[in-house]
């Protein structure tokens, strides 16, 4: 690739020389934590800071032009800019460090690298998959407050799934952060939209019932109607999903 563009969060300017080398060393260095269409590695900066580097696949076909010509913002660019908005609204997401874009001789977008602070020691919501009663009630309520707060602040995460909500618990209570935030909606979030956004969570039916009931209470909506609606949408979503992907445990629908 002929050209590299780099944007660095001013707080991390002192890492510049290390960050600029990432495209050259990415194949050889770091620890792989996810492989798929995109590749994610954890790497260590010279000062010992652990960073998360996500390399987005090269856009193909019409998308190559759509993103290269700036008709639509590339995913990496959105994922670099959105945390700034979330931070201002008090919603947790890994701190963005830098964005690197490679382009070829005729200006078509190659690999994009999104570099964020690595968040360790956090749980995902996959862990409530087949959790026992008595272990998840407080978490379900806290998650409901987090989702309602986000929606009331006019922010909706379009991929609000068990793997994209990380959490930890300490003496102050539960803390949540959202990841994979390149698909967001900013603007009024209706109750129906907000409830529909909860359909992808798995776990015991009771976990979902508590989550949705509490969410409805916070947003001043009928609990029965909310639970009824989300349970139907959730069953539809997981039935479709189950036809294409194996589900690792018994899903109560």
Predicted regions and their residues:
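Conserved alphaE helix
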Residues: 135-146
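AlphaC helix of the protein kinase catalytic domain
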Residues: 124-133
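Juxta-kinase regulatory segment immediately upstream of eukaryotic protein kinase catalytic domains
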Residues: 1-31, 248
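C-lobe/activation-segment region of protein kinase-like
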Residues: 174-253
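Catalytic-loop of the protein kinase fold
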Residues: 155-162
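Active-site flanking residues adjacent to catalytic metal/cofactor-binding acidic residues
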Residues: 53, 158, 179
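Conserved ATP-binding subdomain of kinase catalytic cores across diverse folds
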Residues: 20-123, 148, 152-153
């Amino acid at each position: 690739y002929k050209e590299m563009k780099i944007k660095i969060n001013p707080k991390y300017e002192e890492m510049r020389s290390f960050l600029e080398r990432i495209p050259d060393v990415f194949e050889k260095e770091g620890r792989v934590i996810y492989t798929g269409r995109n590749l994610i590695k954890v790497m260590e900066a010279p000062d010992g800071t652990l960073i998360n580097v996500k390399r987005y696949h090269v856009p193909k076909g019409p998308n190559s032009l759509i993103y290269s010509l700036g008709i639509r913002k590339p995913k990496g660019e959105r994922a670099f800019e959105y945390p700034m908005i979330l931070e201002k609204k008090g919603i947790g997401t890994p701190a963005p460090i830098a964005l690197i874009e490679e382009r070829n001789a005729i200006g078509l977008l190659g690999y994009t690298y999104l570099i964020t602070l690595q968040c360790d020691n956090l749980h995902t919501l996959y862990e409530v998959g087949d959790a026992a009663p008595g272990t998840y009630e407080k978490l379900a309520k806290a998650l409901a407050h987090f989702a309602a707060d986000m929606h009331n602040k006019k922010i909706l995460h379009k991929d609000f799934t068990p793997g994209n909500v990380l959490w930890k618990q300490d003496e102050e209570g539960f803390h949540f952060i959202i990841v994979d935030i390149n698909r967001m909606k900013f603007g009024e979030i209706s109750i129906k939209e907000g409830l529909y956004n909860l359909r992808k969570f798995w776990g015991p039916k009771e976990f979902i019932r508590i989550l949705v009931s509490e969410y409805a209470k916070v947003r001043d909506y009928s609990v029965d109607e909310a639970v009824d609606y989300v349970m139907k949408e959730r069953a539809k979503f997981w039935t479709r999903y189950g036809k294409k992907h194996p589900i690792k445990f018994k899903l109560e629908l």
